[in-house]
Amino acid sequence: VTIDKGDIMVVIGPSGSGKSTFLRCLNCMEDPTGGQIIFNGVDIADPKVDINIHRRHMGMVFQHFNMYNNKTVIQNIMLAPVLVRCQDLKKAKRHNRMLPLTNLFRKEKQEKIEITTSKSQIVAEARAKAEELLKRIGLEDKADVYPSTLSGGQKQRVAIIRALAMNPDVILFDEPTSALDPEMVGEVLD
């Protein structure tokens, strides 16, 4: 199967036929039993590949939403962007701290990484993006509530914008409307 940028692909089959397993393999949440998964030119099924680097470019919307019930809606949306960018910030700071020692043993000297942000700035940017996304789906008034207070359609819309908050190259949807009644299906698709 080849899926190019901008393509929309739907996998249809009876219950138990492997649709969810296929999606979980695409995101390397499960190991494929054979073949390759080429994403942005890299076989991400190769055990030597750091899948976390590639997962940053994949959004996943789960059948059962997979939201953290102990976090508010906005915290659920902000979680991944803040975590990923703070990890990058931490790596850059560690790189810069180790640079004098690293360069002692290398012929080709490494450069210092310019750090242009802070954790508080990362959090502020993630919050602004989350607020903008909530506004786009008409749920800005639900930012500070917990997922348990949302309807199924609202949870699914939040799950979708949570995936969008990472600016992914691709979004994988695992039965995005299966847990919804017909009225809520229309709400999510709108």
For the regions a language model picked out, list residue spans one by one.
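Hydrophobic anchor residue at the start of the ABC signature
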Residues: 160
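Conserved ABC ATPase signature
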Residues: 146-150, 154
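Helix-to-loop junction immediately C-terminal to a conserved catalytic motif
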Residues: 27
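Catalytic Walker B motif of ABC-type/P-loop ATPase nucleotide-binding domains
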Residues: 171-174
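ABC ATPase NBD coupling module
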Residues: 44-59, 83, 119-128
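A short, proline-enriched helix->beta-strand linker immediately N-terminal to the Walker B motif
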Residues: 165-169
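Conserved ABC transporter NBD signature motif
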Residues: 35-42, 46, 94
